[in-house]
Regions:
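Extracellularly exposed regions in secreted/surface proteins, prominently low-complexity, repeat-rich
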Residues: 162-200
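Long, charged/polar, surface-exposed segments that mediate recognition or autoinhibition
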Residues: 111-161
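Bacterial signal peptide processing site
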Residues: 34-36
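Compositionally biased P/S/T/G-rich terminal and signal peptide-adjacent segments
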Residues: 46-55, 69-120
Length: 200
């Protein structure tokens, strides 16, 4: 951090007061960010706590198997949506960057990525955008399949012709149907141990 410069005594008294006040405010703000704010603080566990958490997760199965299950669920949802809406098609996103991101999964709150991750199903891209009525049909199918995972808390940020979304979360899972220029389905799972950790 850059040290505050001394205030010249030649400044009028009121200017010195203002300058000192501003330095005090900025030091508090900057100091708070650099000294107190640590995004990893909530994720830190002692060695014993980490071992206990890992042991408690072993019976959930592996990250890799969970990702396969979620991708199978994404396929079921996409097939159901296509069957329910005439002319609708779908495919898994073939963008290599998206595919790599999906394979890598998301970070867990308390364990590092070399131990556990949150699986992400292969991203679904629908062949056509949904009308308002068709979006309701698709969202209802997502709702039904998400409930099987214990995800029942629904939300939506926007519902207009240019942008629609439906999100349902719970039990560590998130299902998101999103439509802007095209319609997509993304599913993220709870935290699972990597297979290599289970094998130890």
């Amino acid at each position: 951090m850059i040290a505050p410069q001394p205030i010249s005594r030649t400044l009028p008294r009121w200017q010195r007061i203002v300058a000192l006040t501003m330095i005090g405010i900025s030091t508090a703000l900057i100091g708070g960010c650099t000294m107190d704010h640590n995004p990893d603080t909530s994720r830190r566990l002692t060695g014993e706590q980490k071992i206990q958490l890992i042991d408690s997760m072993r019976n959930k199965g592996s990250y890799e198997a969970a990702r396969e299950r979620l991708t199978a669920t994404a396929r079921i949802i996409a097939d159901r949506v296509s069957a329910a809406i005439p002319g609708q098609t779908w495919k898994f996103d073939d963008d290599p960057n998206i595919q790599q991101s999906d394979r890598n999964g998301a970070l867990c709150d308390k364990l590092t990525a070399d131990i556990a991750r949150r699986p992400i199903a292969n991203s679904v891209m629908f062949g056509a955008t949904f009308s308002a009525e068709d979006f309701k049909i698709a969202a209802n199918i997502v709702r039904e399949e998400a409930a099987k995972y214990g995800a029942t808390t629904e939300s939506s940020l926007f519902n207009e012709s240019a942008k629609r979304d439906y999100d349902v979360q719970g039990n560590g899972y998130e299902f998101r149907l999103l439509q802007i220029k095209f319609a997509t389905l993304n599913i993220t799972g709870d935290c699972f141990l990597l297979q290599k950790v289970l094998d130890r």
